């Protein structure tokens, strides 16, 4: 039995390629160890059978953006640094239209954008793509967000019109919001760059109590049929 070495080193020796090429083959899901795909270049091997799959290419996986339907009550969601934890606990949507096979590399160095509070549910974005990170992290808040908010109580007369103009509450002016009734207990609220607590305070400012909220749209991108607790890839032609 030989001493264990990194899979990338063993593969490079076996193929006569560079260590970097070997790493790319492994990260791309092209390498099997005793019949199992291994995506970690640092995985230790000794006498196992190493196999390079047909059609293998030593190319970097392009950066991706992932969309998650966050469940209510997830305490990790308010922490942007917990992207990998959130995604690890979710499931890839079986009806994802993207022709991509999930790889470990797709979950590395993901940035959580526009995080939701613990009590909220709905659409969250994780991205490795610089242009998307810049657009969604823009402090000027140019991108609309749409929420369905379950409420209790009786609103004051003309309350929804006040929200559209910008209303003061607890010593600060809240962001302008377009609001309409979806049914007797649900409001559809559209606004830009809400801060934590803003939706609750918007409701309180017109005499309502927020029971729950769900984000259903960011920019032009709707959550649509993505099930709770599942994620999918952002499609090549989809835009926020």
PLM regions: where:
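Basic, flexible Lys/Arg- and Gly-enriched helix-loop patches that mediate nucleic-acid binding at interfaces
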Residues: 2-240
């Amino acid at each position: 039995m030989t001493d264990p070495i990194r899979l990338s080193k063993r593969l490079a020796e076996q193929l006569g390629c560079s260590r970097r090429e070997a790493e790319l083959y492994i990260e791309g899901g092209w390498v099997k160890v005793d019949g199992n795909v291994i995506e970690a270049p640092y995985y230790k091997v000794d006498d196992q059978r190493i196999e390079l799959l047909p059609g293998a290419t030593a190319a970097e996986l392009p950066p991706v953006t992932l969309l998650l339907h966050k469940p209510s009550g997830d305490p990790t969601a308010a922490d942007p640094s917990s992207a990998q934890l959130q995604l690890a606990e979710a499931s890839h949507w079986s009806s994802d239209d993207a022709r991509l096979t999930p790889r470990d590399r797709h979950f590395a160095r993901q940035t959580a954008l526009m995080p939701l509070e613990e009590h909220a549910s709905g659409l969250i974005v994780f991205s490795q793509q610089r242009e998307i990170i810049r657009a969604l992290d823009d402090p000027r808040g140019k991108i609309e967000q749409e929420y369905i908010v379950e409420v209790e109580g009786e609103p004051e007369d003309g309350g929804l019109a006040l929200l559209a103009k910008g209303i003061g509450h607890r010593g600060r002016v809240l962001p302008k919001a377009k609001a309409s009734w979806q049914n007797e207990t649900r409001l559809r609220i559209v606004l830009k760059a809400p801060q934590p607590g803003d939706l609750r305070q918007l409701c309180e400012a017109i005499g309502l109590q927020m029971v729950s909220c769900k984000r259903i749209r960011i920019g032009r991108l709707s959550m649509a049929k993505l099930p709770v607790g599942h994620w999918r890839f952002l499609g090549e032609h989809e835009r926020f």
